[in-house]
Amino acid sequence: MAAKKNAKPKLVAEGRVNAGEELIATLKRRFAEHPHRHPGLDWQTVEARLDAGALAKLTQMEDTFGEPDVALIEGPSTVVFVDCARESPSGRRSLCYDREAWQARKEARPASNVLDVAGSMGIELLTENEYRDLQTLDEFDTKTSSWVVTPRAIREAGGALFCDRRYGHVFVYHNGAESYYAARGFRAKLRVPTA
């Protein structure tokens, strides 16, 4: 039987003892393949900071197809893993912005919302500036879009922000916070504690 095209990675699902080792190997390979995302950092420094809590969160990022990698979006001394999948993580799409927006939908509610999913995973939604910084490292979201942190005034007016890359430029847009689309997910970050 052929494997499903979008089958979920089985890092932890099968309960294998070496799931953490598999994840570390995946992260190490990705780190080595994209040195331009983290100039001046070496893998040993990063790996030394990966405790059980960070690995559990990174596993969830990987399992939802975020392809986390270290990206220098907060300066050279802060190790931050960011979703670096070319398109918005497919395991985190079709979500409205927050719980208030989810509750406001009377019909056709999505499974959940961005802020609750990110919170349950222990990761943080990217800000618009962090999203723009990430886009200087590679080209992301050329076919999809990603929700970003929305300023309070915009959210109180019922809106929410999302970004994408089209025509070689990064754009920020607004939408009703209760909207959700199959091609819109969210990118997040995980700060790794200092050793």
Residue ranges and their predicted role:
Residues 2-124, 128-195:
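A binding-site-centric feature that preferentially detects glycan-recognition modules on secreted/surface proteins
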